[in-house]
């Protein structure tokens, strides 16, 4: 980027009137000395060795707006007054927004040779802290752990456990020999809570650890001059005032004011979003610190340009750097709850509500039925335990981490487990352009020669250059491209694909080098054959690059002059143009054709270069002629124009497809970039963010030849909004914009504006994903419901702020993330439905026991063995279930309407399947009792006699008499039977939960193998409990006769049939009463 | 997500709830219109009727498979329990405390015995036959009236001194109390191979208690349950069956000290070593007689 230099103010370049001494100010005489030194021309260069103390309240990256307009003007002279007006406005805005309080102080003046003394440096280091960004505050581990201990159902179980102990305490006071059962139960509950807490914490910690290891950086080194010596020190120890040396390829170790620089370019893309490297020199060019050429910023990189070296003084370190400030802006944005966390909370509330209300209801009933209050409390606890799915939250964590793992394999690294689902419910993606949608690499996109535009392949491998290469013009053009280029491949990369090779040179030369290497083969060899005699490198004044070569043809003694540069400058120097390999005079019509092509390519947001050549006549320039680049003793006019070539940072080849997929998934993709509107729009069009047939208001105005104001805004589907326009918008206007346009591009936006846009989207009740890689994206990444950072190009600030990292920087991985997120949401629904179902079967025994006085069908401890034993692996297995239908073709869920656990799910699980399960389990229970001598009818109201320890000859229906222990043992057998009954039906429940709408047979019974692992685990755990541990009386399991395992099978089949019926009717009558009530 | 975290005021919530309970715009009560409520209720009624019907059918089928005379499984009644009369329970098991000089302390005990033995009066046993055989009384056919099997008589007078007929105080008055020991019924249970099961009561050795061995007088003599009371064919086959009893008259219980008495049933198929079940094949009780 050239031009745009506002040489006013001189705040950054020239010395200033002394400001009052700052806290760290040096004595006044020194300052005076500095000033006097500065007046001497010799020292003028070093007078910039000032320590700047400035307050940059707001950061803006709009510094290119003015230049942008200028450039446009240059291309299109017809731009009218309102543009001029706009420009003036913009300038004002710029100043307003920047709100810079640039108070400069002489703190100390140093000689560049000397540098700081180590003692002074140590002092400053102690004063200002190390040159590193303060990591975001971490929640202490113990708090995280305690949160797991009291979160979710844990608090309910803690209450249960404490009640158990209290009940025992009261019992103990009245009767010291009271049974320890309630103590055991309380302890078991406490252990369950602690174990699940530890488990959840471990899962959480594991995923955080992946992140921590990922973030660990190789310590950066910096070359610094201290005590008049060059030293290599860790960049962390840099202090303000240090003189550092930078060379190509380095990362800038702090905010640095350049003192001298040669051919340096810095990549500011992480800060501003511009993909083009910005050249840097010691010149002061702009008041805006972001724009002036003599400041480079912390964490940006110096391009690997040939012979790039620079010396500069550190002006800000650590958190006080621009990057540091943006990072702190990001950390100021609060962490919001993830959608899935809200859903789980909602679900916990429902279940806890049911548990507590049923518990209290039956507590009251029990008290009214003249039960002892302590017994009633024990019932209350049992009801709570039966209702709370103890294992579920751990299961959810596992399911989420499984998905996280699966996504990590697909290059989506999830930092926060809960973020796994968030992408699935995302309805708006605000994507950064550079590096996310584009390859962040200039690539040749179009060529114009023979009065024709050719399209070059811009895909990642670039190998398929299919345009017509037979023309003689192409031969010449390709030669210019290859020769008039200073970029070189780093040696030793022969085996690396061309597009991946490391190049020494700037971005556009790199693009040209790779382009010609792909088409022509070994460029270095070509250059060797065409020996370079002299060259004039590109500079911003003459805006062209020129070199003169001997030709490879030994018979041709002429020198070849090749030149490339800004197209209008090149055209000026030409008098002929090459068409089909033949030189023709450059007439008006040709010039018009050139302009049309130039405008067209420029309109695509591409950077256009012109190429021309000239064979120097052999008589005037014999082989021995000595060329001089200083005096330019060779012709630079009346050359032959060969062609144009345009370059762009092309979209990644996978992006258009991914954007289409997002569209069909009902996700709005908005581009938010710091780059120019033209480029942004061009890229948006090429990736489909603005679809082919939609127009912006401006497009319509242009097409219909009317003023922008006259256009009906409803006609436009797309909108390109610049940061300037955005600044004037009220929140309501922004809401309207976001609601009315399906396709929006925001260009030239500042970090705050990104934040405003995200907030605007969130006001629409949307779940917003933000993708970005730059530091300037980090506040928005943090604010978003899910921030997605790029793993390769992403800055650490962005990665820190993000919830998810795309390891391959591939936007299409987001689509994978959306898919996985939606899948896990559906599967969690299934898991929860599966887990909730048996709650009724667990609850009914207690209710029946209280009301009808049956011997207790199942014990509280036994329940825990279902919740935490047999049911765990199956409910995890549901997380492996494949999607039922094309989940990418439906709208994202509405975060307030489409709940994880809705009324239908709860009702269907509790009142349909749950009830059937309870009946099935009771059947097994009654069978066991009946076959042992107690018929079902005789069991009713038997409770008091049955539970009495003092009745050792209770008669059964056959007249047999049972002692208390014999009854007890039978009761345990009943527990086991009931347990097995539930387990068998849970197998059916597991199978029916595989789908919510499709028939199981369509989904495939055996496609998800893990389900079968789950079923096997269920059976094995039950067998172990019954036969392996049946002799341990404390567990209340007995060895159950083989046939009882099959009593509930008909019920299980009934459940399956009933659910298939439900699904059949849902499919047959979509939208019907049945569908509304039965589809969860 | 700011929208989700909006705090609603209490009145707003109440208003929302009222709107949920009765929505005048759509005529919805609790989220459904009246007709919708009728439909859904009808569905649930139908669903539950069908489910209950199926369950009832299952239970009916289950009952059809069950033999009315013999339970399908008796694995949990391998050895009969033993009970004691009078049965007064303390904190841990049977505890019988009484004072000889205060008849109020033991009349309730003798009353228990008397009412227990009411079932063994000749009138109550009128439907049973007299048995004299010393072996098992196997009956494969239903020889008794009403398709039943015969039961052997056991009358209270067989307990002689402990029958309450000769000594209405059952020996409690003179500090030589009678305890009646009953063995629980198990269908088709055969307690031993040839010798009849016998009750054996002893003091349970307690530390720091040097006791002379317990002297017991058993009724019927030797404390045996005659084999002709076995096997038991169940309530339906033997509706008038009454358990044979053994009365143990403890002759040398020291006064004013608490002793533990253990009465075991000695028979081939009666076990008394189940650690979990204190009443299986044996009964243990604390006894304290004050003077």
UniProtKB/Swiss-Prot annotation, chain B:
Changing residue 178 to S: Impairs the assembly of an active pump and its targeting to the plasma membrane. Residues 58-291 are extracellular. Residues 194-291 are annotated as: immunoglobulin-like. PROSITE patterns: ATPASE_NA_K_BETA_1, ATPASE_NA_K_BETA_2. Signal peptide: none annotated. One of its GO terms (biological process) is intracellular potassium ion homeostasis. Disulfide bonds join 131-152, 162-178, 201-263. It is a single-pass type II membrane protein. Keywords: Cell adhesion, Cell membrane, Disulfide bond, Glycoprotein, Hydrogen ion transport, Ion transport, Membrane, Potassium, Potassium transport, Signal-anchor, Transmembrane, Transmembrane helix, Transport. The chain crosses the membrane at residues 37-57. The ATPase pump is composed of two subunits: alpha (catalytic) and beta (regulatory). Interacts with alpha subunit ATP12A; this interaction is required for the formation of a functionally active pump and targeting at the plasma membrane. Interacts (via N-terminus) with alpha subunit ATP4A (via the P-domain). Belongs to the X(+)/potassium ATPases subunit beta family. This is Potassium-transporting ATPase subunit beta. It comes from Oryctolagus cuniculus (Rabbit).
């Amino acid at each position: 980027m050239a031009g745009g230099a506002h040489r006013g103010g001189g705040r950054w370049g020239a010395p200033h009137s002394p400001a009052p001494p700052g806290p760290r100010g040096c004595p006044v005489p020194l300052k005076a000395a500095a000033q006097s030194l500065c007046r001497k021309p010799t020292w003028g260069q070093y007078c910039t060795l000032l320590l700047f103390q400035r307050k940059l309240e707001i950061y803006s990256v709009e510094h290119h707006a003015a230049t942008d307009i200028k450039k446009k003007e240059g291309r299109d002279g017809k731009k009218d007054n309102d543009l001029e007006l706009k420009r003036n406005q913009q300038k004002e805005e710029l100043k307003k927004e920047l709100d810079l309080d640039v108070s400069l102080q002489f703190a100390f003046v140093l000689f560049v040779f000397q540098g700081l003394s180590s003692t002074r440096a140590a002092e400053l280091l102690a004063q200002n802290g190390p040159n590193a960004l303060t990591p975001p505050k971490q929640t202490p581990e113990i708090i995280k752990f305690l949160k797991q201990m009291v979160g979710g159902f844990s608090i309910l179980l803690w209450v249960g456990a404490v009640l158990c102990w209290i009940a025992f305490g009261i019992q103990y006071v009245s009767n010291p020999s009271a049974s320890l059962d309630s103590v055991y139960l309380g302890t078991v509950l406490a252990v369950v809570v602690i174990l699940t807490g530890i488990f959840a914490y471990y899962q959480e910690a594991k995923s955080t650890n992946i992140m921590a290891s990922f973030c660990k950086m190789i310590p950066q080194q910096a070359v610094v001059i201290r005590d008049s010596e060059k030293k290599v020190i860790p960049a962390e120890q840099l202090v303000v005032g240090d003189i550092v040396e930078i060379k190509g390829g380095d990362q800038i170790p702090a905010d640095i004011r350049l003192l001298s620089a040669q051919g340096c370019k810095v990549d500011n893309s992480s800060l501003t979003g511009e993909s083009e490297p910005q050249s840097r020199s010691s010149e002061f060019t702009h008041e805006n610190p972001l724009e002036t050429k003599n400041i480079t910023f912390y964490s940006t990189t110096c391009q690997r340009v040939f012979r790039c070296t620079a010396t500069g003084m550190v002006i800000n370190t650590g958190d006080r750097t621009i990057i540091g400030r943006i990072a702190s802006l990001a950390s100021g944005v609060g962490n919001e709850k993830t959608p899935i966390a809200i859903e789980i909370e909602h679900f916990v509330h429902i279940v806890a509500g049911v548990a507590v209300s049923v518990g209290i209801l039956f507590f009251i009933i029990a008290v009214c039925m003249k039960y002892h209050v302590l017994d009633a409390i024990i019932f209350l606890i049992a009801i709570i335990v039966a209702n709370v799915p103890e294992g579920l939250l751990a299961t959810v964590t596992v399911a989420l981490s499984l998905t996280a793992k699966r996504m990590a394999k697909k290059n989506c690294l999830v930092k926060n487990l809960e973020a796994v689902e968030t992408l699935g419910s995302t309805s708006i993606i605000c994507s950064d352009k550079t590096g996310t949608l584009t390859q962040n690499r200039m690539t040749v996109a179009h060529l114009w020669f023979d009065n024709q535009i050719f399209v070059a392949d811009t895909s990642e491998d670039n190998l398929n250059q299919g345009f017509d290469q037979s023309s003689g013009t192409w031969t010449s053009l390709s030669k210019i491209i290859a020769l008039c280029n200073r970029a070189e491949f780093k040696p030793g990369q022969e085996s690396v694909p061309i597009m991946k090779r490391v190049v020494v040179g700037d971005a556009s030369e790199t693009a040209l080098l790779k382009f010609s290497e792909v088409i022509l083969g070994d460029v270095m060899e070509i250059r060797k054959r065409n020996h370079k005699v002299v060259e004039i490198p590109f500079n911003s004044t003459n805006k062209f690059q020129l070199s003169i070569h001997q030709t490879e043809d030994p018979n041709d003694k002429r020198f070849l002059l090749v030149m490339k540069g800004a197209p209008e400058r090149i055209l000026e120097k030409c008098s002929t143009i090459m068409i089909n390999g033949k030189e023709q005079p450059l007439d008006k019509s040709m010039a018009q054709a050139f302009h049309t092509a130039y405008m067209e390519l420029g309109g695509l947001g591409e950077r256009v270069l012109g190429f021309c050549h000239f064979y120097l006549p052999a008589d005037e320039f014999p082989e021995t002629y000595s060329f001089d680049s200083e005096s330019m003793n060779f012709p630079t006019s009346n050359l032959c124009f060969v062609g144009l070539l345009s370059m762009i940072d092309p979209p990644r080849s996978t992006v258009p497809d991914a954007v289409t997929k997002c569209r069909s998934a009902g996700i709005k993709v908005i581009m938010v970039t710091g780059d120019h509107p033209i480029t942004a729009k061009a890229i948006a069009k090429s990736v489909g963010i603005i679809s082919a047939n939609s127009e912006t208001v401006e497009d319509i105005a242009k097409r219909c030849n009317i003023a922008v104001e006259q256009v009906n805004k409803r006609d436009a589907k797309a909108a390109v909004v610049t940061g300037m326009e955005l600044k004037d918008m009220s929140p309501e206007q922004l809401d309207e914009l976001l609601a009315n346009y399906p396709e929006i591009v925001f260009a030239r936006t500042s970090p705050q504006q990104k934040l405003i846009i995200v907030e605007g989207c969130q006001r629409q009740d949307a779940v917003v994903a933000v993708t970005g890689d730059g530091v300037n994206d980090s506040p928005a990444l943090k604010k978003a419901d899910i921030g997605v950072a790029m793993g390769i190009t992403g800055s650490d600030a962005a990665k820190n702020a993000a919830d998810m990292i795309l390891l391959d920087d591939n936007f299409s991985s987001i689509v994978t993330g959306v898919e996985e997120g939606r899948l896990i949401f559906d599967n969690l629904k299934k898991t929860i439905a599966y887990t909730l179902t048996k709650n009724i079967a667990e609850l009914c025994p207690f209710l029946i026991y209280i009301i009808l006085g049956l011997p207790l069908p199942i014990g509280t401890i036994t329940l825990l063995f279902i919740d935490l034993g047999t049911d765990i692996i199956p409910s995890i297995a549901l997380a492996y279930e494949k999607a039922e239908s094309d989940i990418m073709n439906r709208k994202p869920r509405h975060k307030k309407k489409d709940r994880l656990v809705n009324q239908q799910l709860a009702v269907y699980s509790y009142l349909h399947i749950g009830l059937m399960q309870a009946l099935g389990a009771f059947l097994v229970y009654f069978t066991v009792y009946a076959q042992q001598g107690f018929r079902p009818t005789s069991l009713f109201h038997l409770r008091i006699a049955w539970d009495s320890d003092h009745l050792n000859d209770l008669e059964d229906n056959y007249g047999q008499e049972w002692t208390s222990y014999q009854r007890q043992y039978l009761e345990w057998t009943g527990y086991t039977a009931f347990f097995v009954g539930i387990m068998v039906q849970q197998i059916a429940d597991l199978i029916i939960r595989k789908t919510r709408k499709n028939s199981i047979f369509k989904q495939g019974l055996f496609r998800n193998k893990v389900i079968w692992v789950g079923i096997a685990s269920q059976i094995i755990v039950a067998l172990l409990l019954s036969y392996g541990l049946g002799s341990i009386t404390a567990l209340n399991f007995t060895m159950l006769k083989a046939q009882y395992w099959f009593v509930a099978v008909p019920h299980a089949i009934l459940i399956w049939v009933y659910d298939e019926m439900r699904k059949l009717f849902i499919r047959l009558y979509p939208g019907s009463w049945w569908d509304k009530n039965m589809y969860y | 997500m700011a929208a989700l975290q909006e705090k609603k005021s209490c009145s707003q919530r109440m208003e929302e709830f009222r709107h949920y309970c009765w929505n005048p715009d759509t005529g919805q009560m609790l989220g459904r219109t009246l007709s919708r409520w009728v439909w859904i209720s009808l569905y649930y009624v139908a669903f539950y009727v069908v489910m209950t019907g199926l369950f009832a059918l299952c239970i009916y089928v289950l009952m059809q498979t069950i033999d009315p005379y013999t339970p399908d499984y008796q694995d949990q009644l391998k050895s009969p329990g033993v009970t004691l009369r009078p049965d007064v329970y303390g904190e841990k098991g049977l505890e019988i405390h009484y004072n000889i000089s205060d008849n109020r302390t033991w009349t309730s005990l003798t009353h228990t015995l008397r009412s227990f033995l009411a079932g063994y009066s000749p009138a109550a046993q009128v439907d049973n036959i007299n048995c004299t055989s010393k072996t098992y009384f196997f009956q494969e056919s239903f020889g008794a009236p009403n398709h039943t099997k015969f039961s052997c008589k056991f009358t209270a007078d067989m307990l002689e001194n402990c029958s309450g007929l000769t000594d209405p105080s059952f020996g409690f008055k003179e500090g030589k109390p009678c305890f009646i020991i009953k063995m629980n019924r198990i269908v088709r249970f055969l307690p031993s191979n040839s010798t009849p099961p016998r009750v054996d009561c002893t003091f349970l050795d307690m530390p720091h208690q040097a006791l002379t061995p317990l002297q017991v007088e058993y009724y019927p003599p030797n404390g045996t349950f005659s084999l002709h009371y076995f096997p038991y064919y169940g309530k339906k086959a033997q509706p008038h069956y009454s358990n044979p009893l053994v009365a143990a008259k403890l002759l040398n219980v020291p006064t004013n000290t608490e002793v533990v008495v253990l009465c075991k049933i000695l028979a081939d198929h009666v076990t008394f070593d189940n650690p979990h079940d204190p009443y299986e094949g044996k009964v243990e009780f604390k006894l304290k007689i004050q003077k």
